């Protein structure tokens, strides 16, 4: 099918079959579309709506152009959010990921520099002295040694150079705003994925099912965050055994005290880094430590098929208090 026919289908409100969507995304990633075609395609997708099938087609096409990591035959997890929650909170996903690695779990953290937040995961990781651009063949060695590796999105997805100028010129939200968390080149078998909009909970969960993740939780935190917070109960869609199930996780059930948005904020990159160093040592503001443990606890639950969530939360609280994340930096 010619690109013009694909654009006509979208313009007339038609639905792209998965194989056609994959073909179109492949052309976009390979630079075969002109800037005008690429912009029209992204606008058409926005009008079409982000279905799980469309998201999964985009993921498969993007990964086909990525620098994939081979040789990982064990369970591994990513803790990541879509961003876009408009909160200048500390980088909880990175703190929880490093804590998990300090507990002995294999963590493949895929991320980028800040877009809508004060400090992105790449900014924090770089500030902590960890490498950003790790060659794919070196990842298994680093994972075996440290249980943690950071995968810098621009390095692993060179094909995105064809998409970024168009996204920048459009200046509006597109499908690519939610794709990032699903494009981990290490293809994690487990995932804790946060979404800023509750309407995306089931879309992302169903997309994870279609892309083969074994066990995952898609969460929307109280207060409108793309991660768990201790402000109140979180909406969660679990992905396991080939199906999805919506549930609620209440921080009060696990002994976490409520907090306010102001208690989770950082105001610039320097503060974000200073706070991160404290948290990884088991020090710093109690509300941030609690949020760290809450997210790490759910991640432990995802990694342990037979552990009750209460036990997973207790283990994570103990690890956070003991500075497990900081030990990864010292290894």
Curated annotation (Swiss-Prot):
- Give the UniProt entry's GO cellular component terms: cytosol
Extract one GO molecular function annotation from the record: magnesium ion binding
Positions annotated to bind Mg(2+) 2: 226-227
Biological process per Gene Ontology, one example term: L-tryptophan biosynthetic process
* Residues that bind anthranilate 2: 167
Q: Recorded E.C. number(s)?
A: 2.4.2.18
Q: Where does anthranilate 1 bind?
A: 81, 112
> According to its UniProt record, which reaction does this protein catalyse?
N-(5-phospho-beta-D-ribosyl)anthranilate + diphosphate = 5-phospho-alpha-D-ribose 1-diphosphate + anthranilate
Name the positions where Mg(2+) 1 binds: 93, 227
Obligatory cofactor(s):
Mg(2+)
Question: Is Transmembrane included in the keywords of this UniProt record?
Answer: no
Q: In which pathway does it act?
A: Amino-acid biosynthesis; L-tryptophan biosynthesis; L-tryptophan from chorismate: step 2/5
- Keywords, sorted A to Z: Amino-acid biosynthesis, Aromatic amino acid biosynthesis, Glycosyltransferase, Magnesium, Metal-binding, Transferase, Tryptophan biosynthesis
One family from Pfam that matches here is Glycos_trans_3N
Enzyme class, first EC level, given as a word: transferase
Cofactor binding description: Binds 2 magnesium ions per monomer.
Family annotation (HAMAP family): TrpD
Subunit info here reads: Homodimer.
Q: Which family does it belong to?
A: Belongs to the anthranilate phosphoribosyltransferase family.
Tell me the function of this protein.
Catalyzes the transfer of the phosphoribosyl group of 5-phosphorylribose-1-pyrophosphate (PRPP) to anthranilate to yield N-(5'-phosphoribosyl)-anthranilate (PRA).
**Name recorded for this polypeptide:** Anthranilate phosphoribosyltransferase
- In its UniProt entry, the species of origin is given as Oleidesulfovibrio alaskensis (strain ATCC BAA-1058 / DSM 17464 / G20)
